[in-house]
Regions:
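Short His-Asn-centered micro-motif
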Residues: 11, 48, 117-119
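Hydrophobic/aromatic ligand-binding patch that stacks against planar heteroaromatic rings
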Residues: 36, 106-107, 125
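PIN-domain endoribonuclease scaffold, especially VapC-family toxins
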Residues: 34-92
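Residues that scaffold the ATP/ADP-binding catalytic core of kinase and kinase-like folds
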Residues: 18-20, 57, 125, 142-143
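Active-site neighborhoods of divalent-metal-dependent phosphate/nucleic-acid chemistry enzymes
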Residues: 78-114, 120
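Short, well-structured N-terminal submotif of metal-dependent ribonuclease cores
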Residues: 1-46, 62
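Acidic, PIN/NYN-like endoribonuclease modules and their adjacent C-terminal/linker elements
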Residues: 110, 114-116, 120-162
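Alpha-helix capping/helix-boundary segments
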Residues: 15-16, 50, 104, 121-122
Length: 162
C-alpha cells in the first residue's frame, strides 16, 4: 500500500484539535487539513464517532476557525458504516478496547483509507500492517512540507505558528 498519493484519508480528531486549539496561530496541521480539503482527488472519510468528536471539539475550542474547519471537513466527509467483521479484526490491537480508536481503524481497514493520527494507540495495528497510518508530522512532511523562512517559524509538528 502506498501513501504517495492517497485517495482516501481519515483525519483523526486529534489532528483536527491540533489545527484549531489556538485560532490565532496558523499551524502546520491546519495547513495539512486545508491541503486535503482543496484536493478534489482525495476523499475524506469519517464514521459516526468521528463526526461526534469533531463537533465536540469545535465546541470545546470555540472560534470561527474551528466552526468553519469542522464544517468544511464534515461537509466533504463520506460517512462510513463500519461492518462488524472489521471491528472484530481491529479490536485485538487496542489495549483497553478504546471503541473510538477501534472504529477509526476498522473504517480504514474496510475502505483502504490512510489514517492520519497523533494517537500512539494505533502503533500496534500500524506495525502489523493491517492499516496504513501516518502521524500528522509525517503527513505534513510528505504533502505540505515545512514552512518557508518567510512564514511563521516552527516545527512541522502541528504545533508551530506565530
Amino acid at each position: 500500500m502506498t501513501t504517495a498519493n492517497p485517495r482516501l484519508v481519515l483525519l483523526d480528531a486529534n489532528v483536527f484539535v491540533s489545527a484549531i486549539k489556538d485560532p490565532a496561530r496558523s499551524t502546520d496541521t491546519f495547513r495539512l487539513l486545508v491541503y486535503f480539503l482543496e484536493r478534489a482527488d482525495i476523499r475524506i472519510l469519517a464514521n459516526e464517532i468521528l463526526v461526534r468528536e469533531y463537533l465536540r471539539y469545535a465546541e470545546v475550542f470555540p472560534s470561527p476557525t474551528a466552526a468553519a474547519l469542522a464544517s468544511a471537513v464534515l461537509d466533504r466527509a463520506e460517512i462510513v458504516g463500519v461492518d462488524e467483521r472489521f471491528l472484530k479484526a481491529c479490536a485485538p490491537y487496542f489495549q483497553g478496547g478504546n471503541i473510538a480508536d477501534i472504529v477509526h481503524a476498522a473504517t480504514c481497514l474496510q475502505t483502504g483509507a490512510l489514517l492520519i493520527s497523533n494517537d500512539r494507540h494505533f502503533e500496534a495495528i500500524r506495525k502489523a500492517q493491517l492499516i496504513e497510518a501516518l502521524t500528522a508530522t509525517e503527513a505534513i512532511r510528505r504533502w505540505v512540507g515545512p514552512r518557508s523562512k518567510d512564514e511563521d517559524p516552527g516545527k512541522a509538528d502541528g504545533r508551530s505558528g506565530a
